Every structure is written in structure tokens, then in C-alpha cells.
């Protein structure tokens, strides 16, 4: 698979052509973080947060891509099987660049979660996920171009596909409607 045809590369090219230096990974992390913290899926609120990260109002083509990205995330989080697909460079990209994007994704996620999270207490598991994301964001350059480095990257990526679901389930998933008491 060629790097230029990956969704990540296409989004990066779109952002770059519009004059934005933000990575698609950081934007996707921001969106997923705010969504998992309970921001809901209002497009206008998402576009405001994205504009802050982008450093200004996005052009229409970028705006449409951001709305599409939000629809994709909403579908992933609200489907029965709740599966997250990370917007990261493909496997043909050098490991060092993929590791940097992974760190940017974590930074974006933490920023989005922090923007939106309510003051309620989080479970120990949720706190551990946030601490893990913070640690992953800091070790971007620690992965070496080797089979072990590849394996480490894949393990971290798999963790990041699952960890946000715990936060979404705890902080944002709509509660089942309570049964209405019947009047006798």
C-alpha cells in the first residue's frame, strides 16, 4: 500500500494545502478525546475546538473533512461492537514517523478529554488509561526501527484502539432510560 493513498496521508495533504501544520493524528485524538469525555456529537462545538487547534477557522474542504471525521467517530463509538480505527500513518511509513504520530494522537486525546471532562470522579481504571496515554505521548522517539520496535508499536496501537472505549463507556455513553414508575 502506498503512503500517498492512505487516509492519513490524504488528510495530511489536505491540512497542509490549507496551511495547517497540525497532524491528522492529533486532530483525530482531539476529537476522540472530547467524544469519550462526553462532548456529544454536535458538529459546531467540534468545529470550534478543531479551529482552536488549527489556529483559525478551517476552509470549507477542511471543514467538510472534519465533519466527516466526526461522523466516522460517532459511528464507531455508538455501534454495537464499539471499535475505534486510529487515524495514523500506514505500515509503510518509517517507524519513527509512526511513533511521532502516535504521540501526537495521545496529546490530542488528552487535550480533547481535558477540554470536555466533567468534574466527576473517574474510576481507577479510567485514571490509569489517562496516565498511560500521558506516558505514551512522552516516549515518541523511544521506538527503534527493528522487529521489537515494530512489535512494541503494534502493541501500543492495539491498546489505543481499546483504551478510549473504557473512558467513553464511563464518561459519555448515554445511560439506559430509567423505567417510568407506573401509577396505580
From Swiss-Prot:
Gene3D superfamilies cross-referenced by the UniProt entry: YgfB uncharacterised protein family UPF0149, PF03695
Q: Name one GO cellular component term.
A: cytosol
Q: A Pfam family matched by this chain, by name?
A: UPF0149
Provide the disulphide bond pattern.
none
Highest taxon listed in the record's lineage: Bacteria
Tell me the InterPro entries matching this sequence: YgfB-like (IPR011978), YgfB-like_sf (IPR036255)
Q: Identify the SUPFAM superfamilies for this entry.
A: YgfB-like
Query: Do you know which PANTHER family this protein is assigned to?
Result: UPF0149 PROTEIN YGFB
HAMAP family from the xrefs?
UPF0149
Q: Which family does it belong to?
A: Belongs to the UPF0149 family.
Protein name, as recorded: UPF0149 protein Pmen_0324
| Species for this entry | Ectopseudomonas mendocina (strain ymp) (Pseudomonas mendocina)
List the taxonomic lineage: Bacteria, Pseudomonadati, Pseudomonadota, Gammaproteobacteria, Pseudomonadales
Amino acid at each position: 500500500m502506498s503512503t500517498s493513498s492512505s487516509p492519513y496521508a490524504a488528510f495530511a495533504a489536505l491540512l497542509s494545502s490549507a496551511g495547517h501544520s497540525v497532524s491528522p493524528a492529533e486532530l483525530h485524538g482531539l476529537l476522540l478525546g472530547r467524544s469519550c469525555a462526553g462532548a456529544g456529537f454536535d458538529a459546531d462545538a467540534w468545529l470550534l475546538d478543531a479551529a482552536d487547534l488549527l489556529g483559525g477557522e478551517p476552509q470549507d474542504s477542511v471543514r467538510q473533512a472534519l465533519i466527516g471525521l466526526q461522523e466516522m467517530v460517532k459511528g464507531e463509538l455508538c455501534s454495537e461492537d464499539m471499535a475505534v480505527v486510529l487515524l495514523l500513518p500506514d505500515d509503510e511509513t518509517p517507524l519513527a514517523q509512526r511513533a511521532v504520530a502516535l504521540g501526537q494522537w495521545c496529546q490530542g486525546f488528552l487535550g480533547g478529554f481535558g477540554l470536555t471532562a466533567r468534574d466527576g470522579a473517574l474510576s481507577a481504571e479510567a485514571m490509569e488509561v489517562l496516565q498511560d496515554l500521558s506516558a505514551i505521548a512522552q516516549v515518541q522517539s523511544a521506538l527503534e526501527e527493528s522487529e521489537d520496535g515494530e512489535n512494541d508499536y503494534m502493541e501500543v496501537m492495539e491498546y489505543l484502539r481499546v483504551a478510549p472505549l473504557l473512558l467513553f463507556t464511563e464518561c459519555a455513553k448515554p445511560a439506559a432510560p430509567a423505567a417510568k414508575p407506573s401509577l396505580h
